[in-house]
Amino acid sequence: MSRAFRAAARGASLLTYYFDLAWRSCRRSKALTALVVLLMGCGAATCMVSFAVFRAAAADPIPWKSQQLFVPQIDNFGPAHNWKGEPPTLLSYTDAVALLQARQARRQVLIYGSKWTVLPGDAQHLPSSQEGDAVSHDFFAMFDAPFRYGGGWSASDDEQRAAVVVISSALNRKLFGGANSVGREIELDAHAYRIVGVLDDWNPSPRFFDVSSTWYPFSRPRQLYVPFSRAIDLHKAASTNFYCSTNSVDPYLPNWDSILHSECAWIAAWVELPRRADVERYRDWLHNYAAEQQRVGRFDWPPNVRLSGVGQWLQIMKVVPKSSALSLIVSVSFLLICLVNVVGLMLARFMRRAPEIGVRRALGASRGAIYRQFLTEAAAIGLAGGVLGLLLTALGMVGIGKVFEPEIARLATLDASLLLLTVLVAVTASLVAALYPTWRAAQVQPAWQLKSNG
Amino acid sequence: MQIRPILAALRRHKMATLLIVLQIALTLAAVSNALFIVKTRVLHLSRPSGTDEAHLVAIRNEWIGQPDARHIDAQMRADLATLRNLPGVRDAFASQAYPLQEGGGGLVRIKHRVEQTTKAQLALSYLADEHAIDTFGITLVAGRNFRADEIGSLGPYDKVAPAVIIITRDLAHKLFPDDVAVGQRVYLSDDGPSTIIGVVDRLQGSYAGSSTRSIDEDTVLVPARYASSDDGASYAGGTVYLVRAQPGQLAAVLRAAPAALVAQNRMRVINPEDGMVTLAQARTKAYATDRGVAIMMGAMCLLLLLATAGGIVGLSSFWVGQRRRSIGVRRALGATRGDILRYFQAENALIVGAGVVLGAALGIAANLSLMAHYELPRMPLWLLGVGALLLWLLGQLAVLGPARRAAAVPPVEATRSV
């Protein structure tokens, strides 16, 4: 037998011995052990459930491309009407169209949301109301929207205000039973539209691209997309965010033309800037555009523009609900309090066994052996807590919709990494909690314990 | 009871004492804040909407194909006549939102004068007609109801400037703290004054969330029908029909109403999933997360208290075990069982007292930092007092077992050694 093997075998048998000791001690103080396991399990589970929700809400919806997508903002409200110096989160029609026509980015997209009534061909079915976005043609390429059938429309369709539409797979199932419907017509708001594409199941979470206008980053998926220019021509009003000032009454807008020429903000814009140099160049262009507006007298304030990436934009839009951040804070503090309690309980547990430690030390066990023994015990308790935590986390994921917004709770998933993390958190927390009690246990003097009464 | 020997004994167990103090402090801070959040949530979800919720149903109706205002207005009148004539229906009216909804009401800014530069009074509005008060089941406490000829028609580009309005008592108090509101004129827009003709006792706005908490009871009834399929500056496209059923007839009305409307005219959309909700359903849905948070916080509190009690039991019994000899000595020197019992109780009271002081400070700090980041009011001090009392009682209860065991140590223990 090699030395290394013998050492390993001895280590393994010692570990079994430590586990055996831990098991005996747990049986001796059942209530205390149960309480520690319960605390660790509950602490870890609440943390994991809130973390799962937080992770779902704070996810990057388009990780492969989020570094290249940006939202431009132009302050057309001015210091008297903007929000603490920040430009509006949407663009006016004037600025949106100027940005689209300038073509300073690789791709540029305008978006606003509206509701459409879909009339079925036959009289048996009842009409339905569907939410959709009016977008310019670069939309599908910019956000890598996957198509099941067909594709997006072209730049010339945009220019000709073509009556074309891209529908979601859900709407395609509802209207055509999931068959390839490209080339067929549907009636929206009593106008005929030709279907050019059917999207695959596509619902980025959060739905970042129209978050500034729709307010619903986790629910109400868009069912159809029509050309922006066509929607404007049809006087299709925005069913989404529309505001003209952050602090005063909206101006009088007697007709569609006055809406288009107003300084009200209601159109979301995105630009695709692949390289870092492009971003700087675009920033300069935005600044110059605002400076030009000031020069011609439209703005009487210096340029106030922003260009934000996806992550930054989701932060500005406060996509992660405050409640989910709050519950993460609450549950982490809960775990910490549990930890403090566990330190106390472990201290009582370990110190009660001072006589046993004294005897083991007197029989030749080193300090290191005592450390190993008690940390093994802590890890074992942590493991038990972790298993309980797993059960509670799984249970929590079922009831999650009762505590968090159901739309977000739906996105929180129990995957392997979360399971592993639960056990890891419980074991690590138990080990940390056991550090001080173990240190105290290792300080027990063999002679003193043997002399005095145990 | 002597404090000095207790302190001397505790000095030998600095870390263990500190741990219990910390445990008590953290528990008090966490439990008081959690209970406070539960209290605000429960308060929030038990607010009455002021309406006859048990018999009300809201039907969201959308128009198809951008019909013009005249057509929509005529259709709405026809729909209302159909609904009011349905068996089991007490009354009905058309609005754009309903109570306990998550948003959808028009926000209005009310000014006393057009040229007013101070901040306008914010309020939430419902479009209404002369049937609104009876349908909601609210009571007029002053003034009169709308007349049929006062109900206007609003288009998407129109400004809201009705000649007459009815407001809630809460809003009346805010607008005219020392005056009678009925007969006064206010401005909902710069286009013209609106005369307050009536005051109703209570009617909650359409936002069930907490974002509009301060103006939830400040509601304006605007006498108009919104006749557009488009979303306007203030109102979402479509119509909400509010229908009040006769007692016991709600189920029948729920079945009959959408069918009757479709039979009247097919060119409409009533979403089969969420187009029709009773106010009871709306309340359950709107406050589901509030209830969940309250339950979760309550469970956490219970567990924390349990853990703290367990910690006290654990450390106290450990101490008792460690001090058996000194207890024996004290007993041998003439201390009674009661003396020993009281010693451990006093020790616990002292430790919990220190923890409570620290915990109160931590709890207030936590409340202040929560207030800075979240919409949470200041925590009342009595709640900390209740928490402190609870922990103190819990401590006494937890220490009782170990202390009794300590009191049971016989004096002869003093003479024993290994």
What are these regions (language model features)?
Chain A
Residues S2-A4, A8, F51-L175, A179, ...:
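Structured, solvent-exposed hinge/loop segments at the ends of secondary-structure elements
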Residues R28-I62:
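Short, strongly hydrophobic transmembrane alpha-helices
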Residues F51, V330-I357, I370, P437:
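A hydrophobic alpha-helix feature that marks transmembrane segments and, especially
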Residues C26, F350-R353, V359-G368, V444, ...:
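Short helix-to-coil transition segments within interhelical loops
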Residues A34, V340, E356-G401, L421, ...:
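Transmembrane alpha-helical interface segments in multi-pass membrane proteins
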Residues L421-G454:
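C-terminal membrane-exit region of the final transmembrane helix in multipass inner-membrane proteins
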Residues M1-F19, R24, R28, L32, ...:
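Membrane-helix entry/capping segments
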Residues D138-G152, A163-M317:
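Mid-to-C-terminal secondary-structure elements
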